Amino acid sequence: MKARNGLQAIAFTGASLAVAAWTSSPKGRELDLQAFKELNRDRGPAADAVFGGVTELGSIWASAGAAAVLAVGGRRRAAARGLTAAGLAWLAGQGLKRVVGRTRPYLDDREGTRLLIGEPRATSWPSSHPAVLLAFVTVAGRELRVGALGRTGLAALAGLVGVSRSYLGVHYPSDVVGGLLLGRAVGVALSD
């Protein structure tokens, strides 16, 4: 890992932890809840279906599938490194969930939350789906020498996965931001 990448990874990790600390303040919690309620609002069955599908792109299984496609296509190094990044982001996210222990939105307010998927077992912060996808696309994108515009599009897709997590009722927006920062930290740390 280059020194610059190490410093960036530390900065993204620090920013992620700052988000967690901010949401423990009364004002941070209030703003997070307001943003969640707006994102979780009913927008009809088409939006439910789109976000229900988009969210799966952030699963570790989607990363495994993408890695398999890359490997079959002769891009084994990109596949292996991308999947390694996704796996490390997932493991880090699961570990942080146990440390932070934040309750999920649908448990905080069962009546006011639209829960559109099954209840996840782990706690809420950080959101692993955007972390996994952003770590994968950061590393695989660099391995594949994807241009800046393509990498921006892939990062935006990870952001959309994050939005889907709030829309579906399983994460506060700050969980998503924490997950995106974690995924970026892992991706940068593992990039050449």
Where are the regions that the model predicts?
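Membrane-water interface at transmembrane helix exits
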Residues: F36, A71, G93-G101, G141, ...
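N-terminal transmembrane-helix/juxtamembrane module of multi-pass inner/ER membrane proteins
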Residues: M1-A62, Q94-A122
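Membrane-embedded catalytic cores of phosphoryl/pyrophosphoryl-handling enzymes
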Residues: R110-D192
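Membrane-helix interface segments
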Residues: A46-A47, R75-A78, Y106, V146-G150
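Transmembrane helix-loop junctions in multipass membrane proteins, especially transporters and channels
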Residues: R75, G101-Y106, V170-S174
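Alpha-helical transmembrane segments of multi-pass membrane proteins
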Residues: A20-T23, A86-K97, L157-V161, R165, ...
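Interfacial segments of alpha-helical transmembrane regions
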Residues: A68-A92
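Alpha-helical transmembrane segments of integral membrane proteins
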Residues: R4-F12, R77-A85, L149-G153, S174-G178
